[in-house]
Swiss-Prot record:
NCBIfam families: PRK00405.1 (NF001616). Belongs to the RNA polymerase beta chain family. This is DNA-directed RNA polymerase subunit beta. Keywords: Chloroplast, DNA-directed RNA polymerase, Nucleotidyltransferase, Plastid, Transcription, Transferase. It is an enzyme of class 2 (transferase). It comes from the Eukaryota. GO terms for molecular function: DNA binding; DNA-directed RNA polymerase activity; ribonucleoside binding. One of its GO terms (cellular component) is chloroplast. It comes from Citrus sinensis.
Amino acid sequence: MLGDGNAGMSTIPGLNQIQFEGFCRFIDQGLTEELYKFPKIEDTDQEIEFQLFVETYQLVEPLLKERDAVYESFTYSSELYVSAGLIWKSRGDMQEQTIFIGNIPLMNSLGTSIVNGIYRIVINQILQSPGIYYRSELGHNGISVYTGTIISDWGGRFELEIDRKARIWARVSRKQKVSILVLSAAMGSNLREILENICYPEIFLSFLTNKEKKKIGSKENAILEFYQQFACVGGDPVFSESLCKELQKKFFHQRCELGKIGRRNMNQRLNLNIPQNNTFLLPRDVLAAVDHLIGLKFGMGTLDDMNHLKNKRIRSVANLLQDQFGLALVRLENVIRGTICGAIRHKLMPTPQNLVTSTPLTTTYDSFFGLHPLSQVLDRTNPLTQIVHGRKLSYLGPGGLTGRTASFRVRDIHPSHYGRICPIDTSEGINVGLIGSLAIHARIGYWGSLESPFYEIFEKSKKVRMLYLSPSRDEYYMVAAGNSLALNQGSPEEQVVPTRYRQEFLTIAWEQVHLRSIFPFQYFSIGASLIPFIEHNDANRALMSSNMQRQAVPLVRSEKCIVGTGLEPQVALDSGVPAIAEHEGKIIYTDIDKIVLSGNGNTYSIPLIMYQRSNKNTCMHQKPQVGRGKCIKKGQVLADGAATVGGELALGKNILVAYMPWEGYNFEDAVLISERLIYRDIYTSFHIRKYEIQTHVTSQGPERITNEIPHLEARLLRNLDKNGIVMLGSWVETGDILVGKLTPQAAKESSYAPEDRLLRAILGIQVSTSKETCLKLPIGGRGRVIDVRWVQKKGGSSYNPETICVYISQKREIKVGDKVAGRHGNKGIVSKILPRQDMPYLQDGRPVDMVFNPLGVPSRMNVGQIFECSLGLAGGLLNRHYRIAPFDERYEQEASRKLVFSELYEASKQTANPWVFEPEYPGKSRIFDGRTGDPFEEPVLIGKPYILKLIHQVDDKVHGRSSGHYALVTQQPLRGRSKQGGQRVGEMEVWALEGFGVAHILQEMLTYKSDHIRARQEVLGTTIIGETIPNPEDAPESFRLLVRELRSLALELNHFVVSEKNFQINKKEA
């Protein structure tokens, strides 16, 4: 956030700032913190000592560039070097060397990491903050039961509770509880210290029996008693050092380590002044917690809201990378310790470089980025998706919640989310409410809390000062929720304003306000902030819209939206998709793949992205926007990327839409479109698919890449070059060979031809046999080969196989079955493509491009699309673009409607088209049926909304099966497009066929075409020779499976076959 202290104006922060700040914090602080924790390592005889000198660590600049790392499938990382010393105590000398510890993956300019050529991003996680929390529950007898839960930095917890007899317990597990006296004594306090440090000693003395005194008579007795209760050990355990270590490891380390954040929270909650560097739970903490618990029993003190953001902390990319670095150093310590012992045992002279290996650090980060739930493959469908992915917040992951156990209260919106977590943007399905998105202006504070900016109002002067508040601080202020000065500081303030105070919304006088919000979009995420007129939509539809905008496919010819919100340039800029000038100067050369800039006496070459595949198979491509000889400034857009125009986000198209029914073809969520969208390539997109194959070294020899493949038709091999790899620019169809490969295999003696056996017997020549394992183009993959990569790893062994990647580009026009959507949750499937002459047309003769169902608006309460539709029509006629801030009713009532009608009226006057704005039915117009030329009976709403084409396309989903694989157990066709599966004929499908009376078709569906093995085999032979297909006599395989499963439950089920000739009953074994 940038702010001017005098004017108090603010700008929107960098949308990738959260990721950059987290990684910089890890490099600047996290690395040194973990390196300082690395211990000095000695051998068993204490003759050799190994230590690291942290002050001299350095990270080397990467050898590879980002683009090369992606192209060659490497990791974009930096080598970490640290000085280490090996001290020989007997000789008194030290050997010091700079050692290589390992590679640390770096963050690139997009705020992501490149691991093995794949863009990955680390998601921020929301966890319960360590500390103590008090809550109350109604017991079985209707009396409130108060408990205090202490949560450690590791996520471990134990509870303090008071029973009906006023005895205080520490519940260490679900079934086991220990007296608070025993716990305090086991932590090192005696009875006298306990009674001196509590406010209610009489309650402790009331349940202090002679037996209890004996248990806490000494620290050893208390530890034995605590261990016996905690570990559920019978008998009389004996006090020993190993017992203390086990208790320390299993209980105190996991449940009593508070960390810095936990110590701060504990001090604030219990009014303690224990130093911040003392991060372990002390007896003083436990006794103060018990005092507060007793006070709650007597009606003093306050309970905690576990879902308040002040009781949560953000585990950012810095914390996750630091944890992994610490884990790698622990593994490195074990390796060094073992190596030193081995060197001493074999009487070798170790050196620091011989002791240290880079494997622990490299493998730890590889496994973290590849396997950790919070490390995800970056979604690169469009520029908006890239930005939003890095700003996600997840309650899931290690130490967090799970989708099946999280309660509704956790998922729900909380007042403390105001200005920090978007109340709209979340995932749909089982994880709803558990994966959120950061508000635009929110940032992560030093203590892991989410902070939001506000303007502080001074009564005497008109100056304002911007400050960031954590969730625990803004409860003490009255925050004006929606005042008009957020945009226009010069206008007079209203007398009464809506205000938020202590999680309640009030209406108070302006003089009582302490803070005010800084921006209308402050409460929303990026996805929700791109929805114009969002205040007129139901929140559920706004949620769908913010999710569907991330699914929009970049089009061949992108177009800026007529009606937007003003955030489009910021999103496009921060996504890194457009090429931006980093220096000012003059363009001296421009090409399709680079731009050369001359400035400050230097020449800069800016490479452009050409037909790069995203991980969602969309096409990333940059188009130069500046010509030779043009002078440019720093920060100017040089080239537009996918889904950007002029440096602004452009996900869809402004097209002419009518809201009316048309012959039932737009029933429910179906959409009728004009063929103009196809012929003019309005919704045409490019998709790039990647196909790869690996060559291994088998036990029979290495696999070969060749164009000489026996037993295959020549037309399938027509596109291969002399090396056996498909040629660039080739047009390939389904079934064509992309890479020819032969795998050697051992053949049996009987499989050899007679001439082969003769050669072996006379000359001893071994005739090799190979199996064809070529890479073939699957169904639906037809297209043009645009790139072929042969990635050869070092060694070339079976552990480092060679990989050949083939990239095929497809041009996809919009067709029936594709999904389209607006920005208000109005989605639909293309049901029919009409000729232009049959589409309804306007009074000026223009046919509409798309027809939506009007019944999809009122019931779903997303009226914002109507405002956008009408304003887009006015903007198209006036050649204007509008940027609308949300909640414009703060200025006056019906502000949105007045704006739309005034613009329509002006468009009607300037274009001399009275039908654009007719006072009898404003926003609507009489249109004509393209088939007959007759006007429709009622006026129809027409306009120009912004419609997106989504990635859910029919080419990826439609599938048909003629023959394929069957499941081994049920013998039914497999399910799924990827397995060449078939459609299951279930109960409802059987009922439908029964309703039509198609008995023979139904029998085929349930026997020949499904799981009747013998009948399936007979069908082929009888079809070839032209005989009738015999009726199956025994049961199908799924019925036999059911019988066997019932038998396993001790239920016998038999079936009988009645002969058609003599009606004899024959029992058949199922």
